[in-house]
């Protein structure tokens, strides 16, 4: 199975979708899922907005078995492990196994993310 087929829809619909706490993440991190392929599990084949409240810090280094693309819409993410700061307008494409984080988000941030597997 794949993600559902979705034609363009009104941004008011997206704006009215709830921000939901991300299971397993620290408090202050919320997601708005646009599309998901449920059989692949909660972390895979997903398109979402991710919002970080000011002052959020993650504790772990992240490594996963799927591809992840991230476009930072607003704010700043500080990758403590790499000692790098990422700003709004920056983009990354992470292959499976790429380490990233932990993060500090001093002023809040929002990102657009796509998670997927390639065979």
Where are the regions that the model predicts?
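Glycine-centered positions in the ABC transporter ATPase nucleotide-binding domain
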Residues: 74-75
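A short, N-terminal "cap"/entry segment at the start of jelly-roll beta-barrel domains
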Residues: 1-44
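Conserved short histidine dyad/triad with adjacent acidic residue
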Residues: 32-64, 83-85, 95-99
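Alpha/beta-hydrolase fold active-site loops
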Residues: 67
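Ligand-binding loop in jelly-roll beta-barrel domains
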Residues: 96-119
